[in-house]
């Protein structure tokens, strides 16, 4: 079994597109999981947020979690 290539784009626009794609994939995975399991995952993401010491990273993580939760609920 070979190691997959997860190289990241160097240009900001491509990187932003990759991040948007990952958010969409995570949302679809949560929707496929079922409500109980998806709820547990979301709770763990929120608990992880409390452990982030860097305020800038915490703000980005919080915004991302909110976007994923909003998309999940649609």
UniProtKB/Swiss-Prot annotation:
Pfam families: DUF2594. It comes from the Bacteria. This is Uncharacterized protein YecF.
